[in-house]
């Protein structure tokens, strides 16, 4: 069984692709390859997980008419040719895409070669590439209802190791890695791989009060941002590749509300304060609504996110054990965590039905 997954650029596109790839490999014995671009995180994440990566040109679609729009047909043609070659070289039997710059060429290549293909939309509002994929005949799979893309609701695929009970031995190893105190509650702050100016600024101004209140802060500031000086109770790092380790030590997470992030944090059972990115299609403001209504998280809009709002929300959660426990319980009882297997089974069934 041979499958190609397409999802590149940001972790939000790559991680669900790799989660399904691992489920296909581990449960169905599939050989899985990935399509990506040379610019994205996939250049390290995909090989690190043991999968072959085939590079194609990214095809960003300009949101406004400009000169880049004139170049679009040529970029699409080049990327389509590269994607077709990758599918032929791997002798792919099915393709699944997760949005982003590499997905549209992957869908078109699969369509042109007569291969079954699947389209997974993680966000509450579907992107253009995925809408195109379904219109071309792909099987639509939505994380939540009402995305604007036809298809069944299956949830967001996450790695099996991210869900389930907390591994205390893994937590101890993670604390040793970052120099964390086992007797202090840990606030894990991240703005994603590139970091967030607004989140970083608020944390910088709030950290002394948070530490004085008895907490410690593990802060992923972003690869391109200057690393602040560490001090007792404050542990800044550029970026965290092993999110599983970070989740095991976190008592509270402060982060953006990308669809993949929300799914992982919820499956890990960690209470969260989400600060939606106020750009794009506005999907981040929608992604966490279900878990917020369930009581597993809180949301502070980016424009309202300051040192004081961060401190107030954090103290309200961590200084009240019953509040913290109820949020954690709400996360743990959610349905997050099983979409990888569901999707892998669908792909395997489709391939098997065509060869029986």
Swiss-Prot record:
Query: Which pathway does the UniProt entry assign to this protein?
Result: Cell wall biogenesis; peptidoglycan biosynthesis
Q: Which CDD domains match?
A: GT28_MurG
| Any GO CC annotation of this UniProt entry | plasma membrane
Q: Which residues are recorded as binding UDP-N-acetyl-alpha-D-glucosamine?
A: 10-12, 123, 159, 193, 240, 284
**Keyword tags:** Cell cycle, Cell division, Cell membrane, Cell shape, Cell wall biogenesis/degradation, Glycosyltransferase, Membrane, Peptidoglycan synthesis, Transferase
Q: Which GO terms describe its molecular function?
A: UDP-N-acetyl-D-glucosamine:N-acetylmuramoyl-L-alanyl-D-glutamyl-meso-2,6-diaminopimelyl-D-alanyl-D-alanine-diphosphoundecaprenol 4-beta-N-acetylglucosaminlytransferase activity; undecaprenyldiphospho-muramoylpentapeptide beta-N-acetylglucosaminyltransferase activity
Q: Which GO biological process categories is it annotated with?
A: carbohydrate metabolic process; cell division; cell wall organization; lipid glycosylation; peptidoglycan biosynthetic process; regulation of cell shape
Main location (coarse class): membrane
Write out the similarity annotation. Answer: Belongs to the glycosyltransferase 28 family. MurG subfamily.
UniProt cross-references to HAMAP family, sorted A to Z? MurG
Query: Can you name this protein?
Result: UDP-N-acetylglucosamine--N-acetylmuramyl-(pentapeptide) pyrophosphoryl-undecaprenol N-acetylglucosamine transferase
